[in-house]
């Protein structure tokens, strides 16, 4: 309960902050529509906004178009709600778009597209969307957790955003992934993004989707731009709605916080109704502990790495932490098995702990964190994340066993040895190297995975009553505060890429949260504040 109360306190320390005024004048708006006849190149028509009455505009091209376009703007609570309605005078394939000038100098700006783009994505490689490739990007809305783009201007301490308002209940297949493509039916998906126009940032949005200057088709693979065209039949109409708002923000972290709160208030997500109870889902999920158990290798494990979804057949990969999480799964199986009187789950979990104690360590005392048994391969490069997650799992196991009046002195000795090795690995600035070898030589010095070590260090300080571990944990958060949280630069927690990373923000928030649990007064409030600041970045991915 104390855990829940602190979490709620962290999330509710600051009330929801309203958006400021956003008054985009007609001269700050540029609109265009592209029309395509299948088999021919599309033609783009710039549109002039002709005022019909207050807040109502007719969008006109320099030549007669086969559709009418009406743009309505409603000011409400300092925000502008824009609704564009197209009515076809004959069958037409269209792509409509707008741009709004922010007035911000593009070279000053940082950008936020929830779950996809943070600041300038400069930690991402040039093979992925980032400023390395272009300073202007348009993307499909369904790449984002919310169909929104925000530009933050540190010079003025302001941020402007545009969000799409729709039901998002339609999608259509296409035969091509690049170039001008015809949709096979109706879609709900438009596009959003930002562009550098003569050194000034503009927010760009439209419908249906397009992506430019590249489309991201799979990991580290950029393809040529794509632009979709949807059929609007003669006599039919379609309406699209966006909302533009502006807000003050002291830094990029506050921009993310306030924009996420605005997204939440705008979208008002609600719990998903489901006929399944928690107990029923636990029962179903516990089948993983049965089906994936491998008991004929030197260390027993649950198979979940490199899984082929077509067969779900067990593989030869035993992994501590990250995807495999064999030791934490064993603890979960043990605890659940005891609760449900499932002796099979309890026995298998204990076999995993026993075999890892006997055969699961490197010569230097670190976990053999990845073993390919059929291939006869053991990963010799250790990661602070997998090692930490293994220690975290064993500390949970030891604490549980202690409550059952059972002792495991050999495990305690092993874990203390690993934790003492952690203290040797820790850098003067509080960080831990991302990857290292048995001889403590560094493979990857990046400190982004540091918060994964904070959790077991805090737990160990309580379990072993050793203040050294708590001091080390506090030093990790000194590093996190200086290099990640204060800079809004969450990176490299995941093991397969050293880039902007939701797990890094989640781990940073959790690390600060753990320290808030074991401290008091102003120190506790400070850690809780750091946890809240990092938590908004983690939340923004969802």
Language-model segments: which ranges?
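Short Pro-Gly-centered flexible turn/kink motifs
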Residues: 229-254
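Bacterial N-terminal signal peptides
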Residues: 8-18
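Alpha-solenoid helical repeat scaffolds
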Residues: 405, 410, 419-431, 436-451, ...
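Well-ordered alpha-helical scaffold segments within catalytic/enzyme domains
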Residues: 327-343, 389-407, 452-466, 507-523
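Low-complexity, Ser/Thr/Pro/Gly-enriched N-terminal "stalk/linker" regions
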Residues: 26-46, 51, 232, 250-319, ...
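Extended, well-ordered alpha-helical scaffold segments
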Residues: 255-291, 341-359, 403-423, 465-482, ...
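Carbohydrate-binding/catalytic loop surfaces
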Residues: 297-319, 365-386, 431-452, 489-514
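Beta-strand/loop-rich accessory regions of lumenal/periplasmic or secreted enzymes
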Residues: 40, 53, 59-234
């Amino acid at each position: 309960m104390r855990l829940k109360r602190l979490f709620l306190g962290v999330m509710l320390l600051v009330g929801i902050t309203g958006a400021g005024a956003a008054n985009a004048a007609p001269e700050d708006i540029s609109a265009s529509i592209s029309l395509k006849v299948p088999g021919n190149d599309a033609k783009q028509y710039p549109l002039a906004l002709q005022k019909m009455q207050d807040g109502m505009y007719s969008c006109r091209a320099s030549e007669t178009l086969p559709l009418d376009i009406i743009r309505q703007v409603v000011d409400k609570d300092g925000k502008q709600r824009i609704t564009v309605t197209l009515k076809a005078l004959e069958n037409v394939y269209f792509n409509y778009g707008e741009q709004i000038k922010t007035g911000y100098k593009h070279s000053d700006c940082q950008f936020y597209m929830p779950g996809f783009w943070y600041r300038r994505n400069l930690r991402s490689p040039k093979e992925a969307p980032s400023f390395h490739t272009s300073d202007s990007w348009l993307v499909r809305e369904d790449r984002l957790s919310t169909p929104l783009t925000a530009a933050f201007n540190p010079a003025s301490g302001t941020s402007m955003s545009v969000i799409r308002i729709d039901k998002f209940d339609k999608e259509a297949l296409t035969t091509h992934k690049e170039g001008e493509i015809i949709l096979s039916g109706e879609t709900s998906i438009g596009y959003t993004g930002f562009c550098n126009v003569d050194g000034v940032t503009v927010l760009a949005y439209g419908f249906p989707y397009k992506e430019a200057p590249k489309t991201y088709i799979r990991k580290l693979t950029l393809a040529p731009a794509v632009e979709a065209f949807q059929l609007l039949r003669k006599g039919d109409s379609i309406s699209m709605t966006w909302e533009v708002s502006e807000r003050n923000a002291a830094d990029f972290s506050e921009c993310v916080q306030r924009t996420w709160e605005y997204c939440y208030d705008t979208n008002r997500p609600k719990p998903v109704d489901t006929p399944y109870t928690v107990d029923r889902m636990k029962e179903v999920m516990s089948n993983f502990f049965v089906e994936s158990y491998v008991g004929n290798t030197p260390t027993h494990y649950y198979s979940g790495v490199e899984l082929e979804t077509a067969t779900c057949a067990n593989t030869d990969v035993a992994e501590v932490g990250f995807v495999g999480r064999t030791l934490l799964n064993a603890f979960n199986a043990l605890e659940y098995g005891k609760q449900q009187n499932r002796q099979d789950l309890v026995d298998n979990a204990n076999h995993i702990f026993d075999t890892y104690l006997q055969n699961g360590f490197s010569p230097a005392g670190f976990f053999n964190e990845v073993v390919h048994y059929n291939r006869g391969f053991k990963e010799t490069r250790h990661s602070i994340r997998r090692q930490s997650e293994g220690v975290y799992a064993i500390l949970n196991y030891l604490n549980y066993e202690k409550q059952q009046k059972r002792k495991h002195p050999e495990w305690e000795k092993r874990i203390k040895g690993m934790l003492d090795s952690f203290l040797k690995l820790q850098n003067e600035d509080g960080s831990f190297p991302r990857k290292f070898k048995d001889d403590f030589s560094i493979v990857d010095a990046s400190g982004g995975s540091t918060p994964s070590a904070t959790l077991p260090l805090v737990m160990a300080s309580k379990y072993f009553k050793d203040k050294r571990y708590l001091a080390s944990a506090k030093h990790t958060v000194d590093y996190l505060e200086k290099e990640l949280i204060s800079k809004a630069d969450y990176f490299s927690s995941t093991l397969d890429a050293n880039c902007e990373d939701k797990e890094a923000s989640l781990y940073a928030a959790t690390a600060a949260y753990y320290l808030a649990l074991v401290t008091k007064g102003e120190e506790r409030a400070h850690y809780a504040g750091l946890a809240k600041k990092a938590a908004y970045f983690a939340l923004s991915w969802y």
